[in-house]
From Swiss-Prot:
The gene is lola. Residues 901-915 have a biased composition (Basic and acidic residues). This is Longitudinals lacking protein, isoforms J/P/Q/S/Z. Residues 115-200, 228-340, 447-469, 482-520, 900-963 are annotated as: Disordered. It is found in: Nucleus. The lineage of its organism: Eukaryota, Metazoa, Ecdysozoa, Arthropoda, Hexapoda. GO terms for biological process: axon guidance; axon midline choice point recognition; axonogenesis; dendrite morphogenesis; gonad development; larval lymph gland hemopoiesis; larval somatic muscle development; nurse cell apoptotic process. Changing A107V: In ORE120; defective in embryonic axon guidance. It comes from Drosophila melanogaster.
Length: 963
């Protein structure tokens, strides 16, 4: 008997597979062998499909011997032709009611099976209006032009497929609607459908083509399968419709699990497998439910799952499978459940694509249908999505259709067999969907990381606020580097390092610098500026590279016992100077690189620390310890911290500098107001063309003279500590005279004009204090220190509620996270937070819009857009004629600078000369309320920029709130 035994291998998804393949071939225009033309437009098609779907085309094509004939359809509109093609290839088509009559007429003339009365399967009145069925009348939405003639009415096997229901679409009819066993959940389904209809419709509209392509084919196969199952299929479809769309086996096969089961026992096992697959998919969906792409599917699936659970009453088996699937579906909520359901209906091809299309129409129809369907007893009707009609109520099925569609379009080639339905397809879909979801989640996570790194960075260390300086760096100043190096270095964390290393450091010239660049030379409250200097110093180590010899050795800077301040570079107009610590540098040593004393920058001040320095570094991250964690005595720390902690101690500023070479020699001053206007000189590492002539020449002269410049920036402990000014050699002085813009040590020579820098989020201002060089060397330090003391770099451990001039702008997030609402000068402005990859939005800083390329910050997104368009990555084309170091790519910015900023500085310089002269040309810093320290710059002459006799220094001062 074993020899006589035969095994029947049944391909449950055979029809849907073939159909989906045709659809895919059509979409890709693969193996097309004929062309249909209407209204001057062409559609390529396959002779086999046309012949199978239309006796007219079959006869016509038999008479044609051309390899690729072209048929011009005279009285057919292109839109109708396309709809008929969709119908033939996908088994269904969505069309508005006003176009239905014309389509049916054209289909009649072309003898399209399923749309014309001449089909062997027996005809249903082509006009839905004529049909007495309630559904036909009620359907105002897209119609599924498949004749839903019940399998029984449909002359059953008479369909061209005759014996095999799967045989042809002409007999396409949704399983007889036993009428909804009444999807007990029809109301719920309706609700789901209603809620989902808009989304589904939108999705359907977008995917309608795809859906139509794959869904029609799948539907026809499914329908035939269902038809074969006959009334059972009808009941199952109704039950499935109650479960509704769990299977989303497009076309009436919704509950085809049952129909499939009824159709063949093999189908049942398949459906069982599908169910398991569906469950798996459901789990995947649960994971993926979060993805928006699945949202529509999720809604549908959820509805389906509910429908499945509730509507399953129709068929026990379906309920079992549906419930099993439905449970997961409901749990997952996304299409996977639907997919699983469709998989469950193994015999029935899950026509998810068709379902999707139907979804949009059937969602509406659902509402209508629930009423009409329940009342409709007649089996023959051209139903809107007739195959789904029952299912249509279950819009959920359509969700699966979407999924299936996606599969068909993208993966059909790879998994042609399973794309449409059946367990295989559902499994494939689930897997695909899962992957997609994970990808999306991953992307979202990445986005979040990109958006939030600042916050994280700021919060890494309990006691410190790390500031990534974006457009400004505290200017290191003649001021004492007073902070004990221990604290800064200790507090510094690697987190910034990682940030920096990730972001910008290519070679960490002195990786240790990062850890302890903060090496503060001496503790001094005034070191706030020093702190800035320290950060810069670390950079300068890099700058030292410019000087030339950075030895990546961590050895402390031993070249000079006295601290030297060297201009490392500038950010915007912010001049960055670095202090080369004296032997304190042992701590500095961690920072550093051996370089010329002048270039060597190992400075840790005020808890500011550079993560690393490298010749190729384009970004330096400055860490500022949180003043809260530090004693107020550490004014430097606090001062710096104030910047960081102004708003939560977690400011994250990106300080992007050109190569150390340019750091050292750029002579650009900073004006907070013009950050947006100024061009960051760091775009090119070493280009002299970016520097003023003086700066460029000084660049070379400085290297030779740096060593000669030894100024002791000895920080006297306490605010009263005396500061040694940098002593300039005669040669250096000569150079300064010749090169007005060069900073010797920390002092900016560019102009004697005082420069006031307002740091928006920081209770401090940076000003240029110009004093005679004589004063620099011999100036009583008390003058500079006292102001610092008064200003109290401490600034109350916490960022003061800075009420600086720039702080009049307040903003708050609106309920809609896509926008922010800003109120400035009693004016409200709403700004979209959507931005391109070149932009970073950081709500923690006053100027939240950051250029990802150069880290400049802007208050308004439009300003950043202009920057990206006109400035970013381009060398400046316009330079200030007054040699103040201002450079920009935008002519209007230069004009405004000359008319406002530069002129105002001259006036301020003139005004300050008098007070300054009274004080003996000693730099004086005056504490100003509102948490900002406004230094009074005593600029001696050189209003015209001829600062040959004077050198200017920048002091970063933080004022105590209490002050």
């Amino acid at each position: 008997m074993d020899d006589d035994q035969q095994f029947c291998l049944r391909w449950n998804n055979h029809q849907s597979t073939l159909i989906s393949v045709f659809d895919t071939l059509l979409e890709n225009e693969t193996l097309v062998d004929c062309t249909l033309a209407a209204e001057g437009k062409f559609l390529k098609a396959h002779k086999v499909v046309l012949s199978a779907c239309s006796p007219y085309f079959a006869t016509l094509l038999q008479e044609q011997y051309d390899k690729h004939p072209i048929f011009i359809l005279k009285d057919v509109k292109y839109q109708e032709l396309r709809a008929m093609m969709d119908y033939m290839y996908r088994g269904e088509v969505n069309i508005s009611q006003d176009q239905l009559a014309a389509l049916l007429k054209a289909a009649e003339s072309l003898q399209i099976k399923g749309l014309s009365d001449n089909r062997t399967g027996g005809g249903v009145a082509p006009k839905p209006e004529s049909s007495g069925h309630h559904r036909g009348g009620k359907l105002s939405g897209a119609y599924t032009l498949e004749q839903t003639k019940r399998a029984r009415l449909a002359t059953g096997g008479a369909m061209d497929t005759s014996g095999d229901v799967s045989g042809s679409r002409e007999g396409s009819s949704s399983p007889s609607r036993r009428r909804r066993k009444v999807r007990r959940r029809s109301m719920e389904n309706d609700a789901h459908d209603n809620s989902n209809s808009s989304v589904l419709q939108a999705a359907a509209s977008n995917q309608s083509i795809l859906q139509q392509t794959g869904a029609g084919l799948a539907v026809s196969a499914l329908v035939t399968t269902q038809l074969s199952s006959g009334p059972a299929a009808g009941t199952s479809s109704q039950a499935s419709s109650t479960q509704q769309q769990q299977p989303l086996t497009s076309t009436n096969v919704t509950k085809k699990t049952e129909s499939a089961k009824l159709t063949s026992s093999t189908a049942a096992p398949a459906s069982g497998a599908s169910a398991s697959a569906a469950v798996q998919q459901a789990h995947l969906h649960q994971q993926q439910a979060q993805t928006t792409s699945d949202a529509i599917n999720t809604e549908n699936v959820q509805a389906q799952s509910q429908g499945g659970a509730q509507g399953v009453q129709g068929d026990d088996e379906d309920i079992d499978e549906g419930s099993a699937v439905g449970g997961p579906n409901s749990a997952t909520g996304p299409n996977p459940a639907s997919a699983s359901a469709s998989a469950v209906h193994a015999g029935v091809v899950v026509k998810q694509l068709a379902s999707v299309v139907d979804k949009s129409s059937s969602n509406h129809k659902h509402k209508i249908k629930d009423n009409s369907v329940s009342s409709v007893g007649s089996e023959m009707v051209i139903e809107p999505k007739a195959e789904y009609d029952d299912d249509a109520h279950d819009e959920n099925v359509e969700d699966l259709t979407l999924d299936e569609e996606d599969m068909t379009m993208e993966e059909l080639d790879q998994t042609a067999g399973t794309s449409q339905g059946g367990e295989g397809s559902s499994q494939t879909y689930a897997t695909w969907q899962h992957d997609r979801s994970q990808d999306e989640l991953g992307l979202m996570a990445q986005d979040a990381q990109q958006r939030d790194p600042q916050d994280e960075a700021g919060q890494n260390e309990g006691g410190e606020s790390r500031i990534r300086v974006r457009n400004w760096l505290m200017l290191a100043d003649k001021s004492i580097i007073g902070k004990s190096s221990d604290e800064p270095s200790d507090k510094l964390t690697q987190s910034k390092k990682s940030l920096i290393s990730d972001a910008k450091t290519t070679n960490k010239t002195s990786t240790p610098i990062r850890p302890k660049v903060s090496t503060t030379t001496t503790s001094t409250s005034t070191a706030a500026a020093a702190a800035a200097a320290a950060t810069i110093a670390a950079k300068q180590a890099a700058a030292a590279i410019a000087s030339s010899n950075i030895n990546n050795n961590n050895s402390s800077l031993t070249q000079t016992v006295t601290q030297t301040v060297t201009r490392i570079g500038s950010i915007g107009r912010t001049t960055i100077a670095c202090i080369t610590p004296a032997n304190n540098g042992n701590k500095s040593s961690s920072s550093n690189c051996n370089v010329d004393a002048a270039s060597a920058a190992a400075l840790a001040a005020a808890g500011v620390e550079l993560d690393s320095i490298d010749d190729t570094m384009t970004e330096v991250i400055v860490k500022i310890e949180n003043p809260e964690s530090m004693p107020l005595n550490d004014d430097e720390d606090d001062a710096v911290c104030n910047e960081a902690i102004e708003d939560e101690n977690t400011f994250d500023y990106d300080l992007k500098l050109g190569s150390p070479l340019s750091w050292t020699y750029d002579a650009v001053k900073i004006e907070n107001e013009e950050f947006e206007d100024s061009y960051l000189m760091d775009n090119d590492d070493d280009d002299d063309d970016l520097l003023t002539t003086a700066a460029a020449t000084q660049k070379h002269a400085k290297q030779s003279n740096e060593k000669q410049m030894a100024g002791s920036m000895v920080a006297g402990a306490g605010s009263g500590g005396a500061v040694k000014k940098i002593v300039l050699s005669a040669q250096q002085q000569q150079q300064l005279l010749e090169q007005q813009q060069h900073l010797q040590h920390l002092q900016l020579q560019p102009t004697s004009q005082s420069l006031q820098i307002k740091l928006p989020a920081i209770p401090a201002t940076i000003t240029t204090i110009s004093a005679p060089k004589q004063m620099m060397s011999g100036a009583g330090t008390s003058g500079s220190l006292t102001p610092n003391n008064n200003c109290t770099l401490m600034s109350n451990k916490l960022g003061l509620p800075v009420k600086g001039q720039n702080l009049d702008l307040h903003w708050s997030h609106s309920d809609d996270n896509r926008y922010r609402v800003l109120v400035q000068n009693k004016r409200t402005r709403k700004e979209s937070l959507e931005h391109s990859a070149d932009m970073i939005y950081n709500a923690d800083i006053e100027k939240p819009w950051v250029c990802r390329n150069c880290n400049r910050t802007y208050k308004w997104k439009n300003s950043l857009k202009c920057h990206l368009k006109n400035e970013c990555g381009l060398p400046p084309r316009y330079f200030c004629s007054k040699m103040c170091g201002y450079a920009t790519n935008v002519h209007s910015n230069l004009k405004r600078h000359l008319n406002t900023k530069c002129r105002d500085r001259e006036k301020d310089a003139d005004d300050e000369k008098k007070p300054g002269s009274a004080s003996g040309n000693m730099p004086v810093v005056v504490g100003v309320g509102n948490g900002t320290a406004v230094p009074v710059s005593s600029s001696n002459n050189n209003n015209n920029g001829g600062g040959s006799s004077t050198s200017s220094t920048y002091t970063l001062v933080f004022q105590n709130d209490s002050a």
